[in-house]
Protein backbone atom coordinates (compact mmCIF):
# COMPACT_ATOMS: atom_id res chain seq x y z
CA UNK A 1 0.00 0.00 0.00
CA UNK A 2 1.38 3.47 -0.89
CA UNK A 3 2.64 5.51 2.06
CA UNK A 4 0.06 8.28 1.62
CA UNK A 5 -2.85 5.86 1.39
CA UNK A 6 -1.62 3.88 4.39
CA UNK A 7 -1.28 7.13 6.31
CA UNK A 8 -4.79 8.26 5.43
CA UNK A 9 -6.31 4.89 6.34
CA UNK A 10 -4.56 4.58 9.71
CA UNK A 11 -5.48 8.12 10.77
CA UNK A 12 -9.07 7.78 9.59
CA UNK A 13 -9.46 4.62 11.65
CA UNK A 14 -7.73 6.18 14.66
CA UNK A 15 -9.75 9.42 14.64
CA UNK A 16 -13.04 7.59 14.12
CA UNK A 17 -12.70 6.30 17.68
CA UNK A 18 -13.97 8.97 20.07
CA UNK A 19 -11.74 7.87 22.95
CA UNK A 20 -8.61 7.93 20.79
CA UNK A 21 -9.58 11.26 19.26
CA UNK A 22 -10.19 12.87 22.66
CA UNK A 23 -6.98 11.46 24.14
CA UNK A 24 -4.93 12.66 21.17
CA UNK A 25 -6.16 16.25 21.24
CA UNK A 26 -5.93 16.44 25.04
CA UNK A 27 -2.35 15.18 24.78
CA UNK A 28 -1.51 17.89 22.22
CA UNK A 29 -2.96 20.60 24.47
CA UNK A 30 -1.21 19.34 27.61
CA UNK A 31 2.10 18.89 25.79
CA UNK A 32 1.90 22.43 24.41
CA UNK A 33 1.26 23.76 27.92
CA UNK A 34 4.17 21.73 29.32
CA UNK A 35 6.58 22.95 26.63
CA UNK A 36 5.55 26.60 27.00
CA UNK A 37 5.96 26.38 30.79
CA UNK A 38 9.27 24.58 30.38
CA UNK A 39 10.65 27.29 28.10
CA UNK A 40 9.90 29.86 30.80
CA UNK A 41 11.38 27.60 33.46
CA UNK A 42 14.63 27.39 31.49
CA UNK A 43 14.98 31.17 31.73
CA UNK A 44 14.70 30.85 35.51
CA UNK A 45 17.33 28.11 35.51
CA UNK A 46 19.64 30.19 33.35
CA UNK A 47 19.41 33.14 35.73
CA UNK A 48 20.05 31.38 39.03
CA UNK A 49 23.36 30.48 40.61
CA UNK A 50 24.38 26.83 40.63
CA UNK A 51 27.37 24.73 41.53
CA UNK A 52 30.25 23.56 39.35
CA UNK A 53 30.73 19.81 39.57
CA UNK A 54 34.09 18.13 39.60
CA UNK A 55 34.03 15.85 36.56
CA UNK A 56 37.06 13.55 36.22
CA UNK A 57 36.15 12.74 32.61
CA UNK A 58 35.87 16.35 31.42
CA UNK A 59 39.16 17.13 33.13
CA UNK A 60 40.97 14.66 30.86
CA UNK A 61 40.76 16.71 27.65
CA UNK A 62 39.96 20.08 26.09
CA UNK A 63 36.50 20.53 24.53
CA UNK A 64 35.90 19.78 20.84
CA UNK A 65 33.28 21.62 18.78
CA UNK A 66 30.95 18.93 17.41
CA UNK A 67 27.86 21.12 17.05
CA UNK A 68 27.07 20.32 13.43
CA UNK A 69 27.73 16.61 13.87
CA UNK A 70 25.49 16.48 16.94
CA UNK A 71 22.57 18.33 15.39
CA UNK A 72 22.84 16.41 12.12
CA UNK A 73 22.28 13.20 14.09
CA UNK A 74 19.49 14.77 16.15
CA UNK A 75 17.50 16.21 13.25
CA UNK A 76 18.01 13.13 11.11
CA UNK A 77 16.69 11.02 13.98
CA UNK A 78 13.68 13.27 14.57
CA UNK A 79 12.70 13.31 10.90
CA UNK A 80 13.10 9.54 10.57
CA UNK A 81 11.11 8.91 13.74
CA UNK A 82 8.34 11.26 12.64
CA UNK A 83 8.14 9.51 9.27
CA UNK A 84 7.72 6.17 11.06
CA UNK A 85 5.50 7.22 13.95
CA UNK A 86 3.03 9.23 11.89
CA UNK A 87 2.08 5.96 10.15
CA UNK A 88 0.95 4.55 13.50
CA UNK A 89 -1.21 7.12 15.36
CA UNK A 90 -1.32 5.07 18.56
CA UNK A 91 2.48 4.91 18.59
CA UNK A 92 2.74 8.64 17.88
CA UNK A 93 0.36 9.32 20.75
CA UNK A 94 2.54 7.20 23.02
CA UNK A 95 5.61 9.15 21.87
CA UNK A 96 4.02 12.52 22.64
CA UNK A 97 2.91 11.37 26.09
CA UNK A 98 6.30 9.89 26.94
CA UNK A 99 8.08 13.01 25.78
CA UNK A 100 5.78 15.26 27.82
CA UNK A 101 6.42 13.23 30.97
CA UNK A 102 10.15 13.25 30.30
CA UNK A 103 10.13 17.05 30.01
CA UNK A 104 8.39 17.23 33.39
CA UNK A 105 11.08 14.97 34.84
CA UNK A 106 13.74 17.28 33.37
CA UNK A 107 12.15 20.30 35.02
CA UNK A 108 12.02 18.56 38.40
CA UNK A 109 15.60 17.30 38.08
CA UNK A 110 16.95 20.70 37.06
CA UNK A 111 15.09 22.42 39.89
CA UNK A 112 16.56 20.01 42.43
CA UNK A 113 20.06 20.11 40.88
CA UNK A 114 21.07 23.76 40.28
CA UNK A 115 24.28 23.53 38.27
CA UNK A 116 26.65 25.92 36.58
CA UNK A 117 27.83 24.96 33.11
CA UNK A 118 31.26 23.33 32.83
CA UNK A 119 33.80 26.14 32.90
CA UNK A 120 35.30 25.51 29.46
CA UNK A 121 32.25 24.38 27.49
CA UNK A 122 31.74 25.20 23.83
CA UNK A 123 28.07 26.30 23.53
CA UNK A 124 25.87 23.94 21.56
CA UNK A 125 24.25 26.38 19.12
CA UNK A 126 21.28 24.88 17.32
CA UNK A 127 21.96 25.76 13.63
CA UNK A 128 18.22 25.77 12.83
CA UNK A 129 17.39 28.15 15.69
CA UNK A 130 20.30 30.42 14.87
CA UNK A 131 19.33 30.51 11.19
CA UNK A 132 15.65 31.32 11.60
CA UNK A 133 15.48 32.94 14.99
CA UNK A 134 17.29 34.79 17.71
CA UNK A 135 16.87 32.29 20.49
CA UNK A 136 19.04 32.59 23.56
CA UNK A 137 21.81 30.04 23.91
CA UNK A 138 21.16 28.09 27.10
CA UNK A 139 24.04 26.66 29.08
CA UNK A 140 22.51 25.56 32.39
CA UNK A 141 19.83 23.13 31.21
CA UNK A 142 22.11 20.36 32.35
CA UNK A 143 20.72 17.61 34.54
CA UNK A 144 19.78 15.61 32.62
CA UNK A 145 20.78 15.69 28.94
CA UNK A 146 17.63 16.25 26.91
CA UNK A 147 19.28 15.40 23.60
CA UNK A 148 20.54 12.05 24.86
CA UNK A 149 17.25 11.22 26.56
CA UNK A 150 15.18 12.11 23.50
CA UNK A 151 17.19 9.91 21.16
CA UNK A 152 17.03 7.02 23.62
CA UNK A 153 13.28 7.52 23.87
CA UNK A 154 13.06 7.24 20.08
CA UNK A 155 15.04 4.00 20.32
CA UNK A 156 12.41 2.66 22.71
CA UNK A 157 9.47 3.84 20.61
CA UNK A 158 10.52 2.68 17.15
CA UNK A 159 9.58 -0.93 16.49
CA UNK A 160 11.61 -1.76 13.37
CA UNK A 161 14.73 -3.63 14.41
CA UNK A 162 17.10 -1.95 11.93
CA UNK A 163 15.93 1.51 12.92
CA UNK A 164 16.17 0.65 16.61
CA UNK A 165 19.82 -0.25 16.13
CA UNK A 166 20.45 3.02 14.28
CA UNK A 167 18.74 5.06 17.00
CA UNK A 168 20.75 3.31 19.69
CA UNK A 169 23.99 4.06 17.83
CA UNK A 170 22.94 7.69 17.32
CA UNK A 171 22.11 7.94 21.03
CA UNK A 172 25.60 6.78 21.95
CA UNK A 173 27.21 9.13 19.41
CA UNK A 174 25.28 12.15 20.66
CA UNK A 175 26.01 11.22 24.27
CA UNK A 176 29.73 11.07 23.55
CA UNK A 177 29.59 14.26 21.47
CA UNK A 178 28.01 16.47 24.14
CA UNK A 179 30.57 15.20 26.64
CA UNK A 180 33.46 15.84 24.24
CA UNK A 181 32.13 19.36 23.70
CA UNK A 182 31.81 19.86 27.49
CA UNK A 183 28.17 20.85 27.00
CA UNK A 184 27.15 18.46 29.78
CA UNK A 185 28.73 16.86 32.78
CA UNK A 186 29.20 13.13 32.39
CA UNK A 187 26.52 12.39 34.98
CA UNK A 188 23.96 14.42 32.97
CA UNK A 189 24.45 12.08 30.05
CA UNK A 190 24.82 8.87 32.04
CA UNK A 191 21.42 9.19 33.76
CA UNK A 192 19.50 10.49 30.72
CA UNK A 193 18.50 7.05 29.33
CA UNK A 194 17.16 6.03 32.74
CA UNK A 195 14.76 8.99 32.80
CA UNK A 196 13.69 8.24 29.22
CA UNK A 197 13.08 4.59 30.07
CA UNK A 198 11.15 5.50 33.23
CA UNK A 199 8.91 7.89 31.28
CA UNK A 200 8.27 5.21 28.68
CA UNK A 201 7.42 2.51 31.22
CA UNK A 202 5.14 4.78 33.27
CA UNK A 203 3.06 5.76 30.25
CA UNK A 204 2.92 2.14 29.08
CA UNK A 205 1.77 1.05 32.54
CA UNK A 206 -1.16 3.46 32.56
CA UNK A 207 -2.10 2.57 28.99
CA UNK A 208 -2.14 -1.14 29.78
CA UNK A 209 -4.07 -0.48 32.98
CA UNK A 210 -6.61 1.54 31.01
CA UNK A 211 -7.06 -1.27 28.49
CA UNK A 212 -7.70 -3.79 31.28
CA UNK A 213 -10.41 -1.55 32.76
CA UNK A 214 -12.30 -1.25 29.47
Which residues does each PLM region occupy?
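N-terminal transmembrane-helix/juxtamembrane module of multi-pass inner/ER membrane proteins
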Residues: 2-77, 115, 122
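Alpha-helical transmembrane segments of multipass membrane proteins
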Residues: 30-38, 42, 105-110, 195-200
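Membrane-interface loops
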Residues: 45-54, 86-164, 171, 211-214
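Membrane-interfacial alpha-helical segments at the cytosolic side of multi-pass membrane proteins
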Residues: 78-83, 148-167, 193-203
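Membrane-proximal cytoplasmic C-terminal regulatory module of class A 7TM GPCRs
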Residues: 202-214
Amino acid sequence: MPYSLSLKTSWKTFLSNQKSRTEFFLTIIILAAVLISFSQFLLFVEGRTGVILFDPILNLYSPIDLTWFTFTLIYLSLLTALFELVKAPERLLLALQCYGLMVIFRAIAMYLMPLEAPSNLIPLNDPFVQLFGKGNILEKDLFFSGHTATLFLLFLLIEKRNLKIIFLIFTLLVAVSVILQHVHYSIDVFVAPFFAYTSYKIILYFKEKGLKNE
